[in-house]
């Protein structure tokens, strides 16, 4: 899956999970600061990404995923 395809899928999931417009979801968007996620939202978002991409994101890794771009990079690395 290309980086662009991953970004589009992540953007769609983030928009749905956080009830924000997909146009607001950019690679540099911080889940908490820019998109208004709280800690529970972040946990639910990680679970949604795990399911959508059929990967596991350990808690230690999830703590380092702060932006949409971080999520895309992590998923891209896992699928390589």
Swiss-Prot record:
One of its GO terms (biological process) is lipid A biosynthetic process. Carrier of the growing fatty acid chain in fatty acid biosynthesis. Transmembrane segments: none annotated. One of its GO terms (molecular function) is acyl carrier activity. Belongs to the acyl carrier protein (ACP) family. It comes from Synechococcus sp. (strain CC9902). The lineage of its organism: Bacteria, Bacillati, Cyanobacteriota, Cyanophyceae, Synechococcales. This is Acyl carrier protein. Disulfide bonds: none annotated. Its main location: cytoplasm. The modification O-(pantetheine 4'-phosphoryl)serine is found at residue 39. 4'-phosphopantetheine is transferred from CoA to a specific serine of apo-ACP by AcpS. This modification is essential for activity because fatty acids are bound in thioester linkage to the sulfhydryl of the prosthetic group.
């Amino acid at each position: 899956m290309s980086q662009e395809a991953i970004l589009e899928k992540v953007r769609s999931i983030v928009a749905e999970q956080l009830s924000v417009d997909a146009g607001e979801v950019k690679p540099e968007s911080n889940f908490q600061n820019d998109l208004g996620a709280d800690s529970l939202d972040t946990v639910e978002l990680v679970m949604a990404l795990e399911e959508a991409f059929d990967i596991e994101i350990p808690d230690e890794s999830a703590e380092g995923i702060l932006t949409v771009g971080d999520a895309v990079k992590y998923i891209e690395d896992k699928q390589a």
